[in-house]
Amino acid sequence: YPDTYQFNTPHNAVYAINKMLVNFDEKYTDDLRQKVTDSGYSIREILTIAFLVERETDGTDRGKIASVIYNRLNNPSSGTMGYLQIDATLAFLNGGKVPTEADKAIDSPYNTYLYKGLPPAPIANPGLDAIKAALDPEKTGYFYYALGDDNTHSFFKTLDAQQRFLRTQTRYN
């Protein structure tokens, strides 16, 4: 769980991991546990969705990003046809660089452009706000979003609307 930890030496990695797990267990309240149960997703799946939310936003639009993820997962014959197409997974695969078109061809189950559905597991530690967004996303009809020149996300119901927006943004041209 992302937090500030103090470790006195000599302790090993197992000690550090256990301390983080205990902290997560303290933050993972009965209410959150019930929401996970009610969601129909496993805790691993919720944490995977939460890490995607965490990595895709500065925090201002977590609920909308979570909504897009669920819309893509729950409507595999609409929008992106079940592919999440999350750039944060490409950044994980390429060592943290801005994703390129070539990165979309990296053969890995974490590549959400090549593989449908969720990646096998989280690749980052999501914060509590991202976990809450994964458990209670906004209700929208959005399947697409893009970061604009003003560094805020815009959301779209159709690929055509997103593509029109992208043509107006210098960062994509």
Q: How would you label these PLM feature ranges?
A:
Residues Y1-N173:
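Bacterial extracytoplasmic/cell-wall-associated proteins, especially those involved in peptidoglycan
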